[in-house]
């Protein structure tokens, strides 16, 4: 063995000894750490038992959701003396009259703001909202919790005043900390039309207080949207376009402290769940106040809320656990031959859109875009000035049609279900369902375009044998709103499809017309 080999062997032995010593030290250190940890835990346990009062220590502290630490969450709402002095019987009556239910895990028990006088806001915002007679139920109940920085789930029908319900507290929080830069308020909405509508309402408030607001959605170039995003504190967006902008690095959501998901159930129906989760991950949960507004409260929406909301207060207006129609809407259902529907439509327009009713707004629903395009041509041929929103039209054409209808340039609007939810079109007097939608739930959302903000309205529906599998569900909705049920509809059967089991198959429940009906529940 050469000298070099002997030296090399010695080096290897030394190296192995060093490694062994390091391992031994690490083992001793780990053992010591475990002992100290055990002693510490034992001392803590003894301390908590002191005074013969045993205190239960949570086993998994890390599983608890972090409490918000943002400026938004640290703002505390102070209830006015005038509101505090109201007798409890007045509050109870208000809850009963408006079918309000509040689930309050924090036991705050904040009273609803029955009048704008009980609300203390910046004078410019106060002046804007005071143009209305009084807060809507969702506003009255949600505002105290939102102004206190709490997470809130609002379950209420479309047209209940949800935009101001989340918009007023959002602007109020912004004004309390005007030094911050970047996007602080983010509202996510399922459709371009609804996003534009929310933007139109919010910009009234942001303009009053010198804040910048922008709206981003697909179907238009991104360049202008990128510019607006850099200047805005308030952003209204559809999930798809916002995610595109995030992935290309054009938007920073790290400063968002007020997040709103509007029409959450609708977004899940449209398959946006993963997009929403990816967007939310770009915000800071520790300083984020989160709001969710939804017309229904199915399992999927509940699960989404549980993943990113912190002890949310749930405010429900109306019978939201079951599918119900607005009782201010007169529902008329006619069973007709499918071949005569368009002829029948012309008769209905003479009834609802001529003479003294010539200037009343009428919204007509078709099921598919091809049907809508055909009906649009037919009505124009018959001399009607009609605007239309359906899939064969460009975004610019759809926006123009909606603006014409809102402004009164055209008082007839033909739409597919793209416009069935969320669009706040004031003073729609009549909804005509030329073709029944694919679900009874969509029917309720369609007719909800009328009878809004305390007004009355009419929904006239043409029902054919092709939709007979939906007859039982429609009967339930009619009965639930105390509306007449035509004999021709009952002839199709009064059962509703309730469940489907992989082994048992579909099974049904008959509607007992002698009793108050059990309304449809969507699991």
Curated annotation (Swiss-Prot):
Q: Which GO terms describe its molecular function?
A: ATP binding; ATP hydrolysis activity; RNA binding; RNA helicase activity
User: Is Transferase found in the keyword set?
Assistant: no
Q: What EC identifiers does the entry list?
A: 3.6.4.13
Determine if Nucleotide-binding is one of this entry's keywords. yes
Please report the name of this protein according to its UniProt entry: ATP-dependent RNA helicase DBP3
Q: Please give the superkingdom of this protein's source.
A: Eukaryota
Q: What class of enzyme is it?
A: hydrolase
Coiled-coil annotation reads 20-54
- Please explain the role this protein plays, according to its UniProt record: ATP-dependent RNA helicase required for 60S ribosomal subunit synthesis. Involved in efficient pre-rRNA processing, predominantly at site A3, which is necessary for the normal formation of 25S and 5.8S rRNAs.
Q: Where is the composition biased (Basic and acidic residues)?
A: 1-21, 49-67
Which of this chain's residues are annotated to bind ATP? Answer: 156-163
Q: Which reaction does it catalyse?
A: ATP + H2O = ADP + phosphate + H(+)
**Biased composition range(s): Basic residues:** 22-48
Domain Helicase ATP-binding, chain residue ranges per copy: 143-315
SUPFAM superfamilies, sorted: P-loop containing nucleoside triphosphate hydrolases (SSF52540)
Copy the domain comment: The Q motif is unique to and characteristic of the DEAD box family of RNA helicases and controls ATP binding and hydrolysis.
Cellular component per GO?
nucleolus
Annotated Helicase C-terminal domain ranges read 344-493
Motif position, DEAD box = 262-265
Under the heading PROSITE patterns, the entry gives: DEAD_ATP_HELICASE (PS00039), HELICASE_ATP_BIND_1 (PS51192), HELICASE_CTER (PS51194), Q_MOTIF (PS51195)
Lineage, top ranks:
Eukaryota, Fungi, Dikarya, Ascomycota, Saccharomycotina
Q: Which Gene3D superfamilies match?
A: P-loop containing nucleotide triphosphate hydrolases
Keyword set, alphabetical order: ATP-binding, Coiled coil, Helicase, Hydrolase, Nucleotide-binding, Nucleus, Ribosome biogenesis, RNA-binding, rRNA processing
């Amino acid at each position: 063995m050469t000298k070099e080999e002997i030296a090399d062997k010695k080096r290897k032995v030394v190296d192995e000894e060093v490694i062994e010593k390091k391992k031994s030290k690490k083992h001793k250190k780990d053992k010591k750490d475990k002992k100290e940890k055990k002693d510490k835990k034992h001392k803590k346990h003894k301390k908590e038992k002191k005074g013969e009062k045993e205190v239960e220590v949570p086993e998994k502290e890390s599983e608890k959701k972090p409490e918000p630490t943002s400026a938004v969450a640290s703002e505390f709402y102070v209830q006015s003396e005038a509101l505090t002095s109201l007798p409890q019987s007045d509050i109870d009556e208000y809850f009963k009259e408006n079918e309000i239910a509040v689930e309050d895990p924090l036991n705050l028990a904040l009273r609803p703001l029955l009048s704008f006088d009980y609300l203390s806001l910046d004078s410019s915002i106060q002046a804007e909202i005071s143009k209305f007679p009084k807060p809507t139920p969702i506003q009255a109940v949600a505002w105290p919790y939102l102004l206190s920085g709490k997470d809130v789930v609002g379950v209420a029908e479309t047209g209940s005043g949800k935009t101001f319900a989340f918009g007023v507290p959002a602007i109020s929080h912004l004004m309390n900390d005007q030094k911050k830069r970047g996007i602080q308020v983010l509202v996510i909405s399922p459709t371009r039309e609804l996003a534009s509508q929310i933007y139109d309402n919010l910009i009234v408030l942001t303009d009053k207080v010198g804040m910048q607001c922008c709206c981003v959605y697909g179907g238009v170039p991104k360049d202008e949207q990128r510019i607006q995003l850099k200047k805005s504190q308030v952003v209204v967006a559809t999930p798809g376009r916002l995610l595109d902008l995030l992935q290309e690095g054009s938007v920073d959501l790290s400063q968002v402290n007020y997040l709103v998901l509007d029409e959450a159930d609708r977004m899940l129906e449209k398959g946006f769940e993963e997009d929403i989760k990816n967007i939310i991950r770009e915000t800071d949960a520790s300083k984020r106040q989160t709001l969710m507004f939804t017309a229904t409260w199915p399992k999927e929406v509940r699960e989404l809320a549980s993943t990113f909301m912190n002890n949310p207060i749930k405010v429900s207006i109306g019978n939201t656990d079951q599918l119900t129609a607005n009782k201010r809407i007169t529902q008329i259902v006619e069973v007709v031959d499918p071949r005569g529907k368009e002829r029948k439509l012309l008769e209905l327009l003479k009834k609802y859109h001529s003479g003294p009713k010539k200037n009343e707004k009428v919204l007509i629903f078709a099921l598919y875009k091809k049907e809508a395009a055909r009906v649009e041509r037919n009505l124009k041929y018959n001399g009607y000035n009609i605007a239309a929103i359906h899939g064969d039209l460009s975004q610019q054409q759809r926006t123009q049609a909606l603006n014409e209808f809102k402004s009164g340039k055209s008082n007839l609007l033909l739409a597919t279900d793209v416009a069935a939810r969320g669009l706040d079109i004031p003073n729609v007097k009549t909804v005509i369902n030329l073709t029944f939608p694919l679900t009874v739930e969509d029917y309720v959302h369609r007719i909800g375009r009328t009878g809004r903000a305390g007004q009355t309205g009419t929904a006239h529906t043409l029902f054919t044998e092709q939709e007979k599998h939906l007859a039982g569900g429609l009967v339930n909705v009619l009965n639930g709103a105390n509306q007449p049920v035509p004999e021709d509809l009952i002839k199709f059967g009064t059962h509703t499809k309730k469940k489907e089991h992989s082994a048992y198959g579909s099974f049904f429940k008959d509607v007992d017309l002698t009793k108050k009906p059990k309304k449809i529940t969507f699991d």
